[in-house]
């Protein structure tokens, strides 16, 4: 269920301060964050975030069509290594 419109979008305070600082000073350095739950706002377009996926930081460049989504959606936490091969078929050959 989506968030109520009267509440507005959620962005962690510390992340909001970093974004405001970057916009004021025209600073285009990567903003490192653990806040996967923060929503991407229109003023974040053009900035690059390093979003933590539980192991390392994944660089995410924010474009216009990402507005309204959360930062964590663009930094996957699980890696798929493929299913195990069938051992019986290897033995017959």
Curated annotation (Swiss-Prot):
The keyword Methyltransferase does not apply. GO terms for molecular function: rRNA binding; structural constituent of ribosome. Keywords: Ribonucleoprotein, Ribosomal protein, RNA-binding, rRNA-binding. GO terms for biological process: ribosomal small subunit assembly; translation. GO terms for cellular component: cytoplasm; small ribosomal subunit. InterPro entries: Ribosomal_uS19 (IPR002222), Ribosomal_uS19_bac-type (IPR005732), Ribosomal_uS19_CS (IPR020934), Ribosomal_uS19_SF (IPR023575). The keyword Ribonucleoprotein applies. Belongs to the universal ribosomal protein uS19 family. Protein S19 forms a complex with S13 that binds strongly to the 16S ribosomal RNA. This is Small ribosomal subunit protein uS19. It comes from Solidesulfovibrio magneticus (strain ATCC 700980 / DSM 13731 / RS-1).
